[in-house]
Amino acid sequence: MKIDFSMGLVEAEAAEKASSMMSYSDQAEHRLREFCAARLAHSELPQIEKTILFARSLKSENAAHPSVRAYFSHPVRVATLALRLETVPSAEIVQLGLLHNVFEVSGLNESNLLKEGYSRRTAEGIRLLTVDRRRQYDPVYLEAFHRKIETHGEDLALIRCVDRLDNLLAFQLIERTKVIEDYLDLTIRFVVPMASRLSPQFGAYLLKLIAYMREVGCDRQLKERYESFLKEAVETAV
């Protein structure tokens, strides 16, 4: 797989990510639909629309993501960026991006996706992308986890790396703890090499982003604004 890696300045991308976390996904969805219309075959667009509606309609079973409505801009951003980076665009990469975290967030499994009409390869890919949170800081587990993703295909590796990129862009909203430092160290150990195999520029950008986030730390004002937005989103959904 060839990718055309291009991102803005780390500071600008982080600011855009923070803004997306304090608004619902409408604008991000509109951008994804426009991008799909420009890059994919017209016949593929109904399946993309179906996936957007399906993923957005799911209920959260995960306390870390109490509001799917507030969270949904993340998978939309992952899908958009993955499609943007692919030299040869595919509808499957968009589906993988939109669905990449549905097992963890909603409690679905492979059979649920198969019943919805998704391919066995897509359903298996989502399973492989779903990390066992009990072992997420275990290097032995992570070695096998990332190897299976790359064995499945470079498209799945791209989703893994773009997912991590989008998560890292939000780190100004997160308090610094040993767990966070471990997360950054393990990203350097496992995700950066994977990204570098897709594109040397991708790996270098991740390293630059990690260095930036370590330098600026947590912006408490941004964090408080995000927590206020999330609280409102949860209360509105009740």
Residue ranges with predicted function:
Residues 2-238:
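Active-site helical microenvironments for divalent-metal-assisted chemistry
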